[in-house]
Amino acid sequence: MASGNARIGKPAPDFKATAVVDGAFKEVKLSDYKGKYVVLFFYPLDFTFVCPTEIIAFSNRAEDFRKLGCEVLGVSVDSQFTHLAWINTPRKEGGLGPLNIPLLADVTRRLSEDYGVLKTDEGIAYRGLFIIDGKGVLRQITVNDLPVGRSVDEALRLVQAFQYTDEHGEVCPAGWKPGSDTIKPNVDDSKEYFSKHN
């Protein structure tokens, strides 16, 4: 796996790539999303098996992310032409069908290298997921091995949690969901949470 330049708490590596957006080719840059959160997820290859389940799941929940001021972008090392062919293939035949999220083409593998998810022996990306805040700062990184897909619910929960901490200055305990108790991050005030939950 490439080491990459992606670091928590630092500006996310910038990128520019051709994407398939609403069935057409469009140049997409990270800076296009300034002021919004971004969930950037990498997947190994088009026309495979776990990948369409993840892409369709993220596409089906795209509006939930947008309500939070967050956009979801998928990336693989395939070309925009392969992405389009896969989108134009019916879901019952292993295709994607129409999508509500862009798919970026990383044919040079630069994005995969910059984000540290390139599986160098095969030239494909591991299942990396990156949450970038509205200031362009990388807030979360997870990388799965190839055979296991990711949870859209968990990605959505993490965006909600980071946005909550940004706005309120409190911290979110394990398994936090909107409406749950948070912790005031100092020794005395944190006892309020711990006395209630232990």
UniProtKB/Swiss-Prot annotation:
Entries under SUPFAM superfamilies matching the protein: Thioredoxin-like (SSF52833)
Tree of life domain: Eukaryota
The keyword ATP-binding belongs to this UniProt entry's keyword annotation: no
Thioredoxin domain boundaries: 6-164
Compartments where located: Cytoplasm
PTM notes: The enzyme can be inactivated by further oxidation of the cysteine sulfenic acid (C(P)-SOH) to sulphinic acid (C(P)-SO2H) instead of its condensation to a disulfide bond. It can be reactivated by forming a transient disulfide bond with sulfiredoxin SRXN1, which reduces the cysteine sulfinic acid in an ATP- and Mg-dependent manner.
Alphabetical keyword list: Acetylation, Antioxidant, Cytoplasm, Disulfide bond, Oxidoreductase, Peroxidase, Phosphoprotein, Redox-active center
GO molecular function, one term: antioxidant activity
Residues with PTM Phosphothreonine: T182
List of residues that carry N6-acetyllysine: K196
EC number(s) stated in the UniProt entry for this protein: 1.11.1.24
Residue positions of the active site: C51 (cysteine sulfenic acid (-soh) intermediate)
N-acetylalanine sites (modified residues): A2
GO CC terms of this entry: cytoplasm; cytosol; extracellular exosome
InterPro entries (UniProt xref): AhpC/TSA (IPR000866), Peroxiredoxin (IPR050217), Peroxiredoxin_AhpC-typ (IPR024706), Peroxiredoxin_C (IPR019479), Thioredoxin-like_sf (IPR036249), Thioredoxin_domain (IPR013766)
Swiss-Prot/TrEMBL GO biological process terms: cell redox homeostasis; cellular response to oxidative stress; defense response to tumor cell; extrinsic apoptotic signaling pathway; hydrogen peroxide catabolic process; leukocyte activation; negative regulation of apoptotic process; negative regulation of extrinsic apoptotic signaling pathway in absence of ligand
Modified residues (Phosphoserine): S112
Substrates-to-products reaction catalysed: a hydroperoxide + [thioredoxin]-dithiol = an alcohol + [thioredoxin]-disulfide + H2O
General remark: The active site is a conserved redox-active cysteine residue, the peroxidatic cysteine (C(P)), which makes the nucleophilic attack on the peroxide substrate. The peroxide oxidizes the C(P)-SH to cysteine sulfenic acid (C(P)-SOH), which then reacts with another cysteine residue, the resolving cysteine (C(R)), to form a disulfide bridge. The disulfide is subsequently reduced by an appropriate electron donor to complete the catalytic cycle. In this typical 2-Cys peroxiredoxin, C(R) is provided by the other dimeric subunit to form an intersubunit disulfide.
Function recorded in the entry: Thiol-specific peroxidase that catalyzes the reduction of hydrogen peroxide and organic hydroperoxides to water and alcohols, respectively. Plays a role in cell protection against oxidative stress by detoxifying peroxides and as sensor of hydrogen peroxide-mediated signaling events. Might participate in the signaling cascades of growth factors and tumor necrosis factor-alpha by regulating the intracellular concentrations of H(2)O(2).
Quaternary structure and interacting proteins, as annotated: Homodimer; disulfide-linked, upon oxidation. 5 homodimers assemble to form a ring-like decamer. Interacts with TIPIN.
Family: Belongs to the peroxiredoxin family. AhpC/Prx1 subfamily.
Protein name stated in the entry: Peroxiredoxin-2
Species name: Homo sapiens (Human)
Source species taxonomy: Eukaryota, Metazoa, Chordata, Craniata, Vertebrata
